[in-house]
Amino acid sequence: MHWQTHTVFNQPIPLNNSNLYLSDGALCEAVTREGAGWDSDFLASIGQQLGTAESLELGRLANVNPPELLRYDAQGRRLDDVRFHPAWHLLMQALCTNRVHNLAWEEDARSGAFVARAARFMLHAQVEAGSLCPITMTFAATPLLLQMLPAPFQDWTTPLLSDRYDSHLLPGGQKRGLLIGMGMTEKQGGSDVMSNTTRTERLEDGSYRLVGHKWFFSVPQSDAHLVLAQTAGGLSCFFVPRFLPDGQRNAIRLERLKDKLGNRSNASCEVEFQDAIGWLLGQEGEGIRLILKMGGMTRFDCALGSHAMMRRAFSLAIYHAHQRHVFGNPLIQQPLMRHVLSRMALQLEGQTALLFRLARAWDRRADAKEALWARLFTPAAKFVICKRGMPFVAEAMEVLGGIGYCEESELPRLYREMPVNSIWEGSGNIMCLDVLRVLNKQAGVYDLLSEAFVEVKGQDRYFDRAVRRLQQQLRKPAEELGREITHQLFLLGCGAQMLKYASPPMAQAWCQVMLDTRGGVRLSEQIQNDLLLRATGGVCV
């Protein structure tokens, strides 16, 4: 006998057939404005592919089936390997096919390649964020290695620049594609890498023997890691491959995988170097300088990844509100809910504008002024955006209600993932101290800010007032005010981009909402309509 106790209605269908690129008006505009309009058709193709139920299911599977550490084989021999679910490998294959790991480093890379790569990264991050960790590290390490690959590894250049993902356990020179990891932090130091105790001994052939450990060694299956270790000349950077030139495994012992709050798909490991062999990059004592060259790019990716996850959470929320009816009308038409969603969309508008201006600065970093822009605003963006992510996703959960608190909605996974980008590559205080370091020591930084703010001076009174407040704080930037200064700098960076490129009503609305310290700002109906149209590709009004 068949029972039917009720009919299911007024429940939105899953958001699993959307174009992640074309539905984001702010992103489409930013890509073209910042010099990568030539990639728009390809981005639309990627956006359609990644927005499907099949792609989204890969993200789910990779997280509910986390990696497994294989220390030994059945006969007791060391393996020091990690086994991943097939979904992980398919996600990685798509990332490499779309060149998210090396687009900007191709010999014939087009102007705007960094911008195009940022957009591709953002689209993939909305499907599954953990797989971006190996991609980020490989992207940041590749330009350094193209200049400094040790002599025994010159055959790595071709696979470093390929569009192939190769998970086979083989020496790098025999593979079609490569991944590069980084090993910096140790038990006693964390962000204080100068306290690292891993020690080295120079060998007759010019290589070094490493003895020590790393506390967080992400992507242990990488073909090589860039490792910080102590030498007679100070903290130095070493190229430590998985396989030695003679084909033997390097003595890198995988001890334990971290049991993390989020980022479940990605393997983070504790390792020990038991006479591992590495090759010095640069000179002894240059470790910090070389790591900082890569650190800016990894920090940018942290901010971009958090922004992408915020974008996905917002998409889920507004899609639900568009279909769900309450008190006789769609939820999105309820005044308070419409105001909440519009404020969320406005926040994303400002972040998108600043992040892709940053991508352009990275693309043109050969210009001293652009390099300084990236140097200042990258840590500021990482600090603010990564901190905003958690309450933003929680707000999206509230839009969905109880179902948003359930795993099927994607939102719990996004919420658990959010804190990692605030911690990786330097936590909040480290970012703020870095901003203060630039403000106190970098020549030309105040001229740069003055030029950026003068360009839009007089267009909005809230912006001008905020500039004056920041100027007062910067007369003597105290360390204990580092967070406030960094936050204000970020807001003014966003505001300057909005005033320069957004419609005047939207730019002024952004400035009032984000910079008016009194609060209580009501967005006009027209601004709300414009924001929600842009945020959904013209679907939700």
Please provide the spans of the model-predicted regions.
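C-terminal helix-coil-helix/basic helical segment that borders enzyme active sites and/or dimer interfaces
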Residues: E349-K382, E398, Q471-E480
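Extended, charge-enriched "interface" segments that sit outside catalytic cores
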Residues: M1-R110, A129, C540-V541
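C-terminal amphipathic alpha-helical interaction region
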Residues: E455-V541
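Flexible, small-/acidic-enriched active-site or ligand-binding loops
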Residues: Q248-Q274
